[in-house]
């Protein structure tokens, strides 16, 4: 029988040595190294979940003592994540994905039975292997290759959100259970869900803004091409770090666990210290005076009450003339002096309009409930926070469906977008009255 200590050591050091040798041979650039890190983190998180499920389902169990996370040997988990995550991400793209997956699955099919005595396989262990391939190996490799090639930005951004959300909540769960003597503490699920949604909204809105306006992601090795100063970034320079810190503090209070508060302090200190210093240097190098001006106007941790209006052209909200609720909304917005938002009649829109339509300074367009949310972002922090909640994935569409079902659907005839030759469009007279009403209301 093999020595358990030797098996555990080999389970980490062999994959680590292979990864180091690959790095020395390939000499990955910054983006490829970042992709390897992302894939390794994805596999570490997903494989932890797979092993917890596998033990509960009886697919396999671990006979080990010490150095465990949720009953899984940490050294074996890290070695597995290096082999399935970092290693394939470092390989050249010319190596076919199917060949990489097939080779790594074959290695695992050989290594799993050889894991005795620390790993004891059940009769249905191949079910756990299939689950691991489906949610760890393949998604991690896809994320890595998309990151290196800069393809499918929405997919990359969404997968990063899933990854870092999982990392945060794995940390939350582990610290909370450890502090409670190995059991999950009592918690009102409804309250926890509402607090999480409320505090996570700015971070998710920031990810969306970086992808749609900046052409990149929050990950330092996959950054935006353009400086983003809209959305949450018009209020605070670090919306994601702020959301993460507030979440940890809030969950620490809900679970009465000081360890989570300590995690928040450490996280904030790191973000404000070494990470903040490095980020500032990098952004100054890439964006120059635009970044310096932005940082003078927008705090890092303390949000502004009103958004900063510099750095971009005004956004435009197009309102259908003759629509009483739309005109009322336009007057309501105009009376509150929105920052860098022009309100115009839909007859002036560059594309046909059937709903309230918002067009950002870069041409990004939304309609209906989402357009309302983007418009109120220009008012103040309270309205902006409501907008970020409303813009959570699926929520704006659900609210739009409810409004449509209650009779607030799109216009039967589109307005604007196709100017006629000769005389102005028949809506122009009504549009003029809308513009006049907005001007008189502003006065």
Model regions and ranges:
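Soluble, non-transmembrane catalytic domains of enzymes that act on hydrophobic metabolites at membranes
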Residues: 310-384, 408-443
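Aromatic-acidic/polar surface patches that form glycan- and anion
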Residues: 225, 235, 364-365, 391, ...
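A conserved hydrophobic position in a structured secondary element of the catalytic/binding core
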Residues: 202-205, 237, 321, 367
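Glycine/small-residue-rich hydrophobic helix-like segments
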Residues: 239, 248, 364-367
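Membrane-anchoring alpha-helices and their flanking helix-loop junctions
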Residues: 1-229, 245-316, 336, 397, ...
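Short hydrophobic helices that act as membrane-entry/anchoring signals
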Residues: 230, 237, 377, 381-412
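Short phosphate-engaging motifs
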Residues: 241, 290, 325
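Solvent-exposed interhelical
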Residues: 225, 230-236, 241
């Amino acid at each position: 029988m093999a020595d358990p200590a030797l098996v555990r050591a080999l389970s980490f050091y062999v994959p680590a040595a292979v990864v180091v040798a690959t790095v020395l041979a390939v000499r990955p650039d910054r983006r490829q190294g970042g992709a390897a890190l992302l894939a390794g983190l994805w596999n570490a998180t997903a494989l932890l979940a797979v092993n917890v499920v596998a033990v509960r389902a009886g697919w396999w169990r671990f006979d080990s003592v010490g150095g465990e996370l949720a009953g899984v040997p940490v050294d074996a988990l890290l070695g597995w994540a290096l082999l399935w995550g970092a290693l394939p991400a470092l390989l050249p793209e010319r190596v076919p994905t199917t060949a990489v997956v097939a080779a790594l699955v074959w290695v695992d099919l050989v290594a799993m039975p050889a894991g005795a005595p620390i790993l004891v396989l059940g009769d249905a262990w191949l079910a756990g292997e299939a689950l691991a391939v489906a949610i760890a190996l393949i998604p991690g490799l896809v994320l890595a290759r998309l990151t290196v090639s800069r393809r499918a930005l929405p997919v990359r951004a969404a997968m990063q959100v899933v990854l870092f959300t999982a990392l945060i909540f794995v940390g939350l769960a582990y610290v909370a259970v450890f502090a409670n003597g190995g059991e999950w503490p009592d918690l009102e699920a409804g309250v926890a869900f509402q607090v999480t949604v409320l505090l996570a909204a700015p971070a998710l809105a920031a990810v969306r803004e970086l992808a749609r306006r900046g052409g990149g992601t929050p990950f330092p090795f996959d950054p935006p091409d353009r400086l983003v100063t809209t959305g949450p970034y018009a209020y605070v320079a670090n919306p994601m770090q702020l959301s993460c810190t507030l979440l940890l503090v809030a969950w620490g209070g809900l679970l009465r666990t000081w360890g989570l508060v300590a995690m928040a302090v450490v996280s904030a200190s790191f973000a404000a210290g070494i990470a903040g210093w490095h980020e500032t240097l990098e952004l100054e190098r890439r964006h120059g005076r635009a970044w310096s001006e932005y940082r003078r106007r927008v705090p890092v941790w303390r949000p502004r009450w009103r958004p900063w209006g510099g750095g971009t052209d005004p956004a435009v909200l197009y309102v259908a003339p003759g629509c009483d609720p739309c005109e009322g909304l336009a007057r309501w917005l105009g009376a509150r002096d929105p920052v860098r938002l022009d309100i115009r009649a839909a007859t002036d829109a560059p594309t046909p309009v059937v709903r309230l339509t918002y067009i950002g300074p870069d041409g990004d367009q939304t309609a209906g409930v989402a357009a309302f949310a983007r418009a109120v972002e220009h008012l103040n922090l309270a309205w902006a926070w409501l907008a970020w909640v409303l813009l959570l994935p699926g929520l704006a569409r659900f609210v739009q469906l409810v409004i449509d079902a209650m009779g607030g659907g799109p216009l039967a005839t589109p307005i604007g977008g196709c100017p006629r030759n000769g005389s102005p469009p028949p809506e122009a007279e009504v549009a003029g009255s809308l513009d006049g009403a907005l001007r008189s209301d502003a006065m």
